[in-house]
Amino acid sequence: MAINIRKTHPLLKIMNHALIDLPAPSNISLWWNFGSLLGLCLIIQILTGLFLAMHYTADISMAFSSVVHICRDVNYGWLIRNIHANGASLFFICVYLHIARGLYYGSYLYKETWNIGVILLFLLMATAFVGYVLPWGQMSFWGATVITNLLSAFPYIGNMLVQWIWGGFSVDNATLTRFFAFHFLLPFLILALTVIHLLFLHETGSNNPLGINSDADKISFHPYFSYKDLLGFFVMIFLLATLALFTPNLLGDAENFIPANPLVTPPHIKPEWYFLFAYAILRSIPNKLGGVLALLFSIFILMLVPLLHTSKQRSIIFRPLTQIFFWFLVANSIILTWIGGQPVEQPFIMVGQIASISYFSLFLIIMPFTSWCENKILSLN
């Protein structure tokens, strides 16, 4: 009998267990495609970023000009930059859908996998933030100034911390240089953590829409789910190409076409769209330190979700009351995203404050209490 090399070779064996002979539940839906799509996004971002880094100059006098040079003079530089900028947006769309899937189907009960995922989200946000500073446009400069300034809210060490991150007394050349270094380094850290994320996932196996044990009904990952993922790849590449070729500046800010000027403040300082929900929560609290803590907690609250699971069922597919509040949470997050892009005036301030309270209430009180109520209703039958 011929020896199958993929099952015996030390390197190929790892790939085989992860991508070919991996036992997968037979009933996982399209919602389980986003993990592989995130892997594709990461590869696209690393490759396009590498080519951009070859032509970019991390100096405040040349950064803006070097981006212009990439778009005008480098072969297909405009395309690489558009793919990289819009690829980030698609990355975050996939991340948020991936998290929503995890919340809906109870995937967060794989605690190690879930918590590493939350750390990955935090690193992804940090990477996107430092990357947004690199073109050195108006919004890059002022965004960096405002967000890094938030660290001054921490007692005693705040001002020292801000100056340490800036490398001086204002956002300057030292800041840009270190942000470029971080932006180059962090994606590789994300890549390493992704491998650990997968390692923990493959220890338990994937969850499924029913939220029940699927050991009795599993099929191999290849060819079934490899081809299913391939369809997702084509759809995502088509969307990315459409965005990058037809409306490359749709999700960007017009202010960033103006070179950074420390003497002129833009009328509305706001981050990229994928940070607006957290930015709205930050702005809705009048106290600076309170706002910073709420901003951090808006992401790290996801780590509390496994601890707040009170239901006897894993998935919320059979829990209509919790389903209602889950969709409230989705709508609430969309409202926060909209509020984050609006000026700081009434009625936006009030709506933002109500949406912020709702966001934390749904996670900490309403959904756990609803699950507990559903348990009581089930026990009555």
From Swiss-Prot:
The lineage of its organism: Eukaryota, Metazoa, Chordata, Craniata, Vertebrata. Heme 1 (or BL or b562) is low-potential and absorbs at about 562 nm, and heme 2 (or BH or b566) is high-potential and absorbs at about 566 nm. Component of the ubiquinol-cytochrome c reductase complex (complex III or cytochrome b-c1 complex) that is part of the mitochondrial respiratory chain. The b-c1 complex mediates electron transfer from ubiquinol to cytochrome c. Contributes to the generation of a proton gradient across the mitochondrial membrane that is then used for ATP synthesis. It is found in: Mitochondrion inner membrane. A ubiquinone binds at residue 202. It is a multi-pass membrane protein. It comes from the Eukaryota. One of its GO terms (biological process) is mitochondrial electron transport, ubiquinol to cytochrome c. GO terms for molecular function: metal ion binding; ubiquinol-cytochrome-c reductase activity. It comes from Negaprion brevirostris. Heme b b566 binds at residues 98, 197. Its cofactor is heme b. SUPFAM superfamilies: a domain/subunit of cytochrome bc1 complex (Ubiquinol-cytochrome c reductase), Transmembrane di-heme cytochromes. Coiled coil: none annotated. GO terms for cellular component: mitochondrial inner membrane; respiratory chain complex III. This is Cytochrome b. Belongs to the cytochrome b family.
